[in-house]
Amino acid sequence: MGCSFSGLNALYDAVNGGGDVWINENRFRIVRQLGEGGFAYVFLVKEVLSDPSITGIAQKIKDPSHISEDGTYAIKKVIIQNNEQLELVREEIRVSSLFSHRNLLPLLDHAIIAVKVTQDQSWKNEAYLLFPVHLDGTLLDNAKTMKVKKEFFSTSDVLQIFRQDDVTEETVNQLCAGVEHMHGFDPPYAHNDIKPGNVLLTHRKGKSPIAILMDFGSARPARKQIRSRSEALQLQEWASEHCSAPFRAPELWDCPSHADIDERTDIWSLGCTLFAIMYGVSPFEFALGESGGSLQLAIVNAQIKWPTGPNPPYPEALHQFVTWMLQPQPTVRPCIGDIIIHVDKLISKFSN
């Protein structure tokens, strides 16, 4: 899917003023802002159809399950400051367009436009990315709410956010399956920023939540050969900018001068995320709060402490599962296929 350029100044003004946004030939009305971070803003929008007979964005969407019945979607606006940021956005669009899986948030459409800055009449670029909307928020949002209420996910829900075992479910497989889809590419892709803030949840009455992994801005081919100190430092610098520190694998903090990096960096992040699903905090931020010291040292040494959880507590087998994923040596850390086999056994043992 190629990037679209045009001089739609009205787009920039509309977003800031709560008006209408055009992505290529489709028009959307800003309803409200959902969030922001860095140079990006996320808005809830509703498609505007001038003629009821027009199908609008629906005709561009390949998977009918991604078509909104009420015309609401999410738009991510990215302010692009320089050519480096422009290339990063283009790469995010390219990578996002590779994936097609029910547990990975799909990019429905996009536009990169040139806009005139009012103050000095100069031009800059902005990107607009269209996605399905999930209004129940992220796993991080839910964890914060549950922590205030001193609530916990059940063992069954914890496992089924990771891996849905009911083959009759439209959302079968969940987080692990989304990661498996990425790792199954040739060459494999790593997400590189798996964390609760990048997992969207949709709650369902009487069922486990639907979990969808989003934000592929850091996703890259997973396998890298490091053969010098310079290459190791370059990887560490890249990781410091693209991989959230509390969920970053040890080999991305302190990379050897001779190393083979692979998709198991994501397994580490998955282990941290599973811990966070259980306790509402990442393992090494919790350890840091308990003992102080350095986040990097806590991660490199895999210092895991267990918070007070629900009553009755989570089973020891679940703790062992987390510890298995948080092996500091990547060569002995499991692959996603191993994770799926193991979590299926846990689900059959502990799910209701």
Identify the function of each model-found stretch:
Residues 183-203:
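Catalytic-loop of the protein kinase fold
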